Design a protein with these regions (language model features):
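P-loop/Walker A NTP-binding region and its immediately flanking N-terminal helices
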Residues: 1-148, 154-158, 164-166, 246, ...
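Extended, largely alpha-helical regulatory/partner-binding modules appended to the mid-to-C-terminal parts
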Residues: 46, 52, 58, 79-82, ...
Length: 339
């Protein structure tokens, strides 16, 4: 069984990073104030379906009265009409029948119209939980008939917290660098973080995972290349910087991830210059070797150097996804370095 399925939260207390959603739902259950329709929206892997299942169990719905529907593959008007007929039957064992419709934005216009009729006058024993990653694609008539909950994209610290919990349960040793890199690569998705950990664990011999293994399995650029490029930018060494970009390209590194890692390191270097008390915070984010490197990088620099580099990197990061040549935005940064 995959780590994500094995460690899916089983109760509200297990949910990480969605305290505002959990708090409201728990109060509604305590006060027996259950709505007939809920809309859970947010980016992928943030726990929408997991919380929907927990909510269903918390209001006493047995498995025989819980229905999960994939909106992507059941998006026609006929399927929704069948659903409308099904909701008319009483629950088998529970007070409520709960219908979880995932990726609800994939329904057709005709299907939405059919669903709307059910949402307008649902039986008292039916609860709908609609989940979507693209709320903007839903008709306003659907949104207005649901109680809306926005699932926030978790911070890297939230993702790291989950990874630490799972690693402890599975008796996995994760070094600080691998923990930080997996959290960054997951891009705010708990599911993606555990999927990456699963993938790395599959080739690990003794459940000890180091950052170089994560780099190798995921194709992430090495920290050596990241540090070399950042150092070249700071010192104005154009030849070295172009050489590092070539090395990253030759190793088939994802230039978007490469730039993101450089951005993170440049930001930490700037924070170390601006506020010495940030050192403790940064120490928990990166390896001791990186901390020493970034601390020395900012020494003696003019005040605007690192902020200017960060602005250029941010611009490059935004341009990479639309660039015909992925390395070009970084190459332009190098070309525009003062001589």
């Amino acid at each position: 069984m995959s780590l994500y399925r094995k460690h899916r939260p089983a109760s509200f207390g297990d949910v990480i990073g969605q305290e505002q959603v959990v708090s409201v739902l728990e109060k509604q259950i305590k006060n027996s104030n259950i709505n007939h329709a809920y809309l859970f929206s947010g980016s992928r892997g943030t726990g929408k379906t997991s919380v929907a299942r927990i909510f269903a169990r918390a209001i006493g719905t047995q498995s025989t009265d819980l229905y999960e529907i994939d909106g992507a593959s059941n998006n026609g008007v006929d399927e929704v009409r069948e659903l409308r007929e099904a909701v008319q039957t009483l629950p088998f064992q529970s007070k409520y029948k709960v219908y979880i419709i995932d990726e609800v934005h994939m329904l057709s216009k005709a299907a939405f119209n059919a669903l709307l009729k059910t949402l307008e006058e649902p039986p008292a024993y039916v609860v709908f939980v609609l989940a979507t990653t693209e709320k903007n694609k839903l008709p306003e008539t659907i949104i207005s008939r649901c109680q809306n909950f926005s699932f926030k994209k978790p911070h890297e610290s939230d993702v790291r917290e989950l990874l630490i919990l799972v690693a402890k349960k599975e008796e996995i040793e994760l070094d600080k660098g691998s923990l930080a890199l997996i959290a960054l690569l997951a891009e705010g998705s708990y599911r993606d973080a555990l999927t990456i950990l699963d993938k790395v664990l599959a080739v690990s011999k003794d459940k000890r995972i180091f950052v170089h293994e994560v780099e190798k399995i995921t194709g992430a650029p090495s920290s050596v290349l990241v540090n070399q490029f950042l150092e070249a930018l700071v010192t104005g060494d154009k030849k070295k910087a172009i050489g590092v970009i070539k090395d990253a390209t030759d190793s088939h590194a994802d230039m978007r991830v490469f730039t993101k890692l450089i951005l993170r390191s440049a930001r930490f270097a700037m924070l170390l210059v601006l506020a010495a008390d940030m050192r403790e915070f940064i120490k928990n984010e990166i390896s001791d070797e990186e901390l020493v490197f970034l601390g020395s990088l900012g020494k003696g620099l003019e005040a605007k150097k690192l902020p200017n580099i960060l602005r250029a990197l941010l611009k490059a990061y935004q341009e990479i996804s639309v660039a015909y040549i992925q390395s070009l935005p970084l190459e332009l940064i190098v070309a525009e370095l003062p001589t």
